[in-house]
Amino acid sequence: GAGKTTMLRDIVRQLSYKSYRVSVVDERSEIAALCEGRSAFDLGFSTDVLEGVDKAEGMLMVLRSMSPDVIVTDEIGKQSDIDAIERITNSGAAVIATIHGRNIDMIKRRDDLKRMLKFFDLIITLSRRKGIGTVEEALTEW
């Protein structure tokens, strides 16, 4: 891909080392890649990982039980994910997530995803145009 998961890991690590309480909900074991309870990647010292559970259910579980400042997950797309993000952001926690789409205009064409945009303060579009992880745009208004 364009480096979305790698960027997520780096953001998690940076936030954790700045003493934010970070919870990663890793439905498909791609962000943390746990092995015997340890991440294959450096995700920082104050990061909790919930792996192998439904994304929406997992986000709400960590919200209730871990009191995170930030919840991180990948590949948002189902209505239940969007509903969970709404509950999380209404509770005061932040969400950092990835979504597949060429650009913001493509995302805005889907009514369910368009509704989700109001829960985010920043949207970054990545590509591989100048190598994996190329930041094409960083938007604070859409």
Residue ranges and their predicted role:
Residues 118, 122-142:
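Conserved P-loop NTPase
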Residues 62-72, 76:
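Proline-aspartate-enriched helix->loop->beta-strand connector
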Residues 16-62:
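P-loop NTPase switch/communication element
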Residues 83-87:
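A short acidic, amphipathic alpha-helical/loop segment
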Residues 24-25, 70-74, 94-100, 125:
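Structural recognition of the conserved hydrophobic beta-strand(s) that form the central parallel beta-sheet
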Residues 1-15:
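Glycine-rich phosphate-binding P-loop
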Residues 34, 104-116:
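Glycine-rich, charge-decorated loop segments at or immediately adjacent to ligand/cofactor-binding or catalytic sites
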Residues 20-21, 44-47, 67-70, 91-97:
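Loop/turn-to-beta-strand initiation segments
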